[in-house]
Amino acid sequence: MLCGNHQLYNNVEAQIANFHEVESALIFNSGYNANVGFFSCVPQRGDIVFYDELIHASIRDGLRMSPAKCYKFDHNDFFNLRDKAEKFAEDFEGEIYVVTESVFSMDGDSPDLESFADICDKNDFNLIVDEAHALGVFGEQGKGLVHKLGLQNRVFAQVITFGKALGCHGAAVLGNENLYTYLVNFASSLIYTTALPPHALASISAGYHFLENLPKTKVLSKLQENIEHFKIEVARLGLLDIFVPSNSAIHCCIVPGNESVKAVSVILKGYDFEIKPILYPTVPKGKERLRICLHSSNSKKDISKILKVVVNTIP
């Protein structure tokens, strides 16, 4: 930062902000750095943060560094959030932040973002949405679930990452110009580290160029078709009781026990399916799982085959 910005930073940040229809985008080295940087410095002493109990570890780490008081609410439970948050709404002088994700990484499910936005509008709360697993999957040109629902002007900040759908390094915090300026001056994970090199920025820009041209391709529609086919097959094969409900590209099959889920993963590997097991303590004991990530390149035959293997493998 002492040497100033490379022009590519200015260009790519403007490209990202324009794409997402927001005032500004500030690039960080990673999603972890973005969340730690944001949550360690934005909520102040005297503020309150309400966060979903299953938020990313990076958000939790950032909140541990924040002087604000932090309270969790039950996963995707709007009513639990409302009951807790509205107790503080009247006569509270500090800022109140509500933190969630548009798609949760270990479940693939989503909150009712419109209801979250409504309660934040009603009480003047600040809504923050981590969009790591929604970019390139939902909305026009893959702009994310916030944009698909038309909420981009009703959230205080979005955190997006480039290591998922775009397949490159980096992340960005989307918000207004004041937030951009504040983070540049106070986000330690941005200030006290070496910035991404120019070739990484070129990769991000190329990824966004691809998203900008998605309507000319069938990539996004093919992915949505695969998601729907997967859900239909799960129901048809009677697997609803072991799969976490999801409308995203992430679908999780619960296989209790670290050794059990690892064994099923090995069997799937024998059928050329690269499905990684998610083990305790990453997820709660008894909730170990297979995490299946769908792609536009998958065929319906592939999807049906993997689910048939699951049927024949899991007791």
PLM regions: where:
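Conserved PLP-binding catalytic core of the aspartate aminotransferase-like
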Residues: 219-231, 237-272, 282, 294-296
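Active-site PLP attachment segment
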Residues: 147-182
